[in-house]
């Protein structure tokens, strides 16, 4: 009976020690996870601080007071996208590095050229894309694409889709824009959904009076 008692005590002690060991491992793992989360948050916050610094000096932003939103939109997109990536421990995938301030691209996403177009109204933004590609005919062929305001992208795609499936629902101005989109696709041998993408913000969100 004594031997059984000793063995039982030893087993209980071993079990308790193992539980303590698991607890310590869990605590250490939690500490490491929290440290990583803190670092991720710090990295993401740095991106937002860079944006704050840029917006905080309007005199150095290209354009007049009414057009500075174009360059603001570029920085908002780059910093917001990078912050989202960094917050979950992924690498930033947007950069201005190696891009001239007046180059045909505004920034790079995953190494690909991106031109940002933020005009007042979806028609104005689409026309700006058409004009840009006339100036740089090989932009798309070299892997480039366009970022436009989220709300305008939704309108553009809605008009495009209704033009394909419910043509009669289009207004006169929407019909004209739809025809221009189809003609542009045929001319460039592309699909709009492949080369035009939404940003994280709407047109109104990048106006200087809003973000200042």
Predicted segments, located by residue:
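Interdomain/boundary linker segments immediately adjacent to catalytic/signaling cores
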Residues: 1-73
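Residue-identity detector for glutamine
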Residues: 11-13, 32-33, 37, 46-47, ...
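Long, charge-dense tracts
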Residues: 36-44, 105, 110, 126-151, ...
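Generic hydrophobic, helix-prone segments enriched in Leu/Val/Ile
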Residues: 45-49, 55, 109-112, 125-129, ...
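Catalytic centers of nucleases
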Residues: 49-134
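Metal-dependent nuclease catalytic core centered on acidic motifs
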Residues: 135-212
């Amino acid at each position: 009976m004594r031997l059984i008692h000793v063995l039982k005590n030893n087993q209980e002690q071993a079990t308790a020690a193992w539980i303590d060991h698991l607890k310590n491992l869990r605590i250490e793992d939690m500490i490491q996870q929290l440290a990583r989360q803190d670092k991720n948050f710090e990295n993401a916050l740095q991106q937002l601080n860079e944006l704050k610094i840029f917006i905080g000096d309007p005199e150095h932003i290209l354009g007049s007071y009414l057009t500075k939103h174009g360059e603001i939109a570029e920085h908002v997109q780059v910093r917001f996208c990078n912050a989202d990536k960094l917050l979950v421990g992924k690498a930033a995938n947007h950069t201005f590095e190696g891009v001239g301030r007046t180059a045909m691209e505004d920034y790079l996403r995953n190494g690909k050229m991106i031109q940002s177009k933020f005009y007042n109204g979806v028609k104005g933004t689409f026309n700006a894309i058409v004009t840009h590609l006339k100036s740089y005919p090989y932009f798309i062929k070299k892997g480039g694409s366009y970022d436009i305001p989220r709300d305008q992208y939704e309108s553009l795609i809605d008009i495009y889709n209704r033009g394909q499936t419910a043509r009669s629902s289009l207004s006169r101005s929407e019909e004209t824009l739809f025809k221009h989109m189809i003609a542009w696709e045929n001319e460039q041998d592309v699909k709009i959904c492949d080369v035009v993408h939404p940003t994280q913000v709407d047109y109104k969100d990048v106006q200087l009076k809003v973000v200042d």
